[in-house]
Amino acid sequence: SPTKTLTMTEILAATTADDWRPNSPDNTLYLEIPSGRVIMELAPNFAPRHVANIKALVAAKYFDGLAITRVQDNFVAQWGDAENARPTAPAARNLAPEFDRADGPDLPFTTLLDADGYAPTVGFSGGFPAARDGRTRRAWLTHCYATLGVGRDMAADSGSGTELYVVIGHAPRQLDRNVTVVGRVLRGIELLASLPRGTGAM
């Protein structure tokens, strides 16, 4: 007989305490906007240099008072210093990209059976949507709804975390391995997804 597809409610009802893990305070990022608080989790296993740089920027209060600069329907909400006018020290302004990482037995990975047009294998790594390629032995975080990424210009090393974005629409998977992904939204995605859309030129 065909396998029964479970609803989200049924999946959650079937979980046990062992299926959940506490969020690490060291890797928790808070974004305060007028409508409330957005809570995000950083992913140092995939982008350690960018995560460290974002933490340094936060400690230096780099983001304090900056604006949400872009809200594009069915795409992203983005914030930071779009003009790069604010000093970043002691954090770096440019970092080598961390589009993917070496795969191996030390990387936890729960494989999904679904076929995927962007990666040989998809699933979750430490709770983050992820993909892997057994041929190249590389793994990366994927651009799914609520993904947290690093904005950049054309140069691959132009993103350091001074501009961040969250996916608020369909999964723009063409960005996988083209932009550094540093985490995901745990709570408050609806606050970003409901922001007024921008009307300015792109």
Stretches with model-predicted labels:
Residues 1-202:
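Cyclophilin-like peptidyl-prolyl cis-trans isomerases
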